[in-house]
Amino acid sequence: MADDGLLLNFSLGDNNIIQPETKLKGGTWRDRLSAKKIAKHHAKGPRTAGDEDSTPRAPRNPNRIEVPSSRPTKRQRTDGGDSGKQQSHTHPHSNQPRQFISSLFTKNPEPQKVEEVKEEGHVEDAKPTNAPLIDGLDTFTNLGLSPSLAAHLLTKLELKAPTAIQKASISQLLKEEGDAFIQAETGSGKTLAYLLPLVQRIMALSKPGAQTDAKGQPIVHRDSGLFAIVLAPTRELCKQISVVLENLLRCAHWIVAGTVIGGEKKKSEKARLRKGLNILVATPGRLADHLDNTQALDVSNVRWLVLDEGDRLMELGFEEEIQGIVKKLDARQRPSRIPGVPTRRTTILCSATLKMSVQKLGEISLKDAVHIKADPEDEDEKARRSKEEESAYRVPAQLKQSYAVVAAKLRLVTLTAFFKRTFMRKGSVMKAIIFVSCADSVDFHFEVFTRKQAKEDGDESSDTDKSEDKPPSSPHGTIAPATAFSNPSNPVTLFRLHGSLPQNVRTSTLGAFAKNKEASVLICTDVASRGLDLPNVDLVVEYDPAFSAEDHLHRIGRTARVGRDGRALIFLQPGCEENYVEVLKRGYRDGGKALTRADANDILKRGFGGNVESGNKDWETKATDWQCEIERWALENPEYLEMARRAFQSHIRAYATHIAAERSMFNIKELHLGHLAKAFALRDRPSKINVPGLRQGKEETKKDFKAERNSAAGKKRKAGGTDLADDIPSANNTATAAQKMRAKMKEHISGANEFNLA
């Protein structure tokens, strides 16, 4: 068919041209949907006056009554009709999540219970309940200890008189050989209460002159066998018991003690067991492992078994291990060739509380046990009480305890203000402990309180002499100057401790905190709340409440020990947490009359330089500036931002683990997650806070510390060699680390070698 040359031209209006639709990619489906709606709205363009008249309208209802409106008619815009353009350029990033900076002092919930705020200076000093006895007749010699041991306590350890629980337990355990349950309040000297009779019994077996061999040496020495085992729930408590025991045995050098705990090398522990031990301090898990796998551990002569902190042993799940240990000790027991050794084993259970778990542990290990306590005259009263009151804890009478109801947004600045005021004057407080709920929170707050100030960064380059006066920092990153609440006249050193650190780092950090003679603060989890006798601890702050009342008892028990004065402060949030005050009052003999309340605003005023009585609001400005500075510091450093998010998530998980009896007071549904996120220097919405990967475990943390130590030692690598771990992050993002590891391995495998001739 021939072309006729016909051309057709169609005229279309500009409004009828169909624009190509751009397909949005990336982001969540909600973000794509909102961006699509915005693009569709902009594509319509601005409406004109003619458009409104040209649109067809529905027929008017004849039954409708027209009422004249008093509102004047709108005037037409005369600015060129660029309202649509202005609207389109107002929020160029409207599809991205915006950060909302909330104010510290607005929309905070008010405390539900209004109580009178008492000043600590107006509280009458109570008589110490765990101090040594003043009566001169109650000396260690009168209790049955040998003169050499009593003289060693007086001259070397500077112990002149026993405490009430030591008096009751030493006399009972030296007279009879039956099982015993020792119950006393924290800080009353329970460790010496069972160690002194133990050492006295073993010294009596090896008394020179009465029982000696042909060479005149005592019969009992390190090769004579193992006579006593002391079990403790934590490694730190085992270390402390071992130190106290070694100090006692300096007057009997022929008796040898040792430890086997988790985290140490089994090879070195087996070597110590082969050399011979008379007293062994151990954790249940490691002792059960040695009983199964170490032939050098002979327990046929064990006649004393001590279970320290029995309630904690059961809480940590050591019930099966303890059952296995008791059965193996019974099965392997043999008559001893050494004269004077008892025929049966004596078991001693120690605990500050008498709970159902402790009673169950007593059923496993004790037989016809004697209940030893500091106040034997109160036994009839306690027998009449209910089981709940029997399990109630006791707080030392000289401990001054207070609580502060602090809103969630103000927690971080209030804690900082409190320690600014505490360490404002040199010598007022020497050592303090901050207890938090999880290890991630410990790491985050340690970085916040030890971060370098902007002024310090500029001074370091010019003033090199001032750096010599700063407290030494730890190569492991667990010790650093506390720049947040230090001042030139009173520098403060901050220590951190939690269970995810390697054992050698935990031991060195705890030892450095105990030996430090300057102002220092330890921020830790409950790993340091049981049995540790840290010297000169004047203040305990529970930033996160304990998971049970018994844990609270052991936390505040780190201060006010053996008759010393001490203070404790707990942070509570407005709302259901205020009911926890009744639990705190039950721990006092007088019903909680000595328990005081601290006002959160007064803490902020004192800490940030304001006067409590004046109406000046400068302290609010200073507190807000400090909070915003911390938030900017976290935003500028991705590492610290991820640390803050991880700490926030771990804190929420830990908050949900309170015991059932107290869960109504710590209801996770009552938490304002947005306000709580601000206490972790976060500006994100709680729903947007997501941290990939898992927290480093003990093994990964141990590898990181080992790698840092090797790099510090300056080990040289072989020429031409490469390390696979160079391109791998420190396991913060597990998926990325695994992906990079596979890529690195593929590079090594695919490279040319002697088998790849091509």
UniProtKB/Swiss-Prot annotation:
Q: Which residues form the Helicase ATP-binding domain?
A: 171-372
| Location of region: Disordered | 26-99, 111-130, 455-483, 691-758
Annotated positions binding ATP: 184-191
- Protein task: ATP-binding RNA helicase involved in the biogenesis of 60S ribosomal subunits and is required for the normal formation of 25S and 5.8S rRNAs.
Q: Which PANTHER family match?
A: RNA HELICASE (PTHR24031)
Q: Any further remarks?
A: Present with 1460 molecules/cell in log phase SD medium.
The protein, known as = ATP-dependent RNA helicase dbp7
Q: Which organism is it from?
A: Neosartorya fischeri (strain ATCC 1020 / DSM 3700 / CBS 544.65 / FGSC A1164 / JCM 1740 / NRRL 181 / WB 181)
Gene for this chain: dbp7
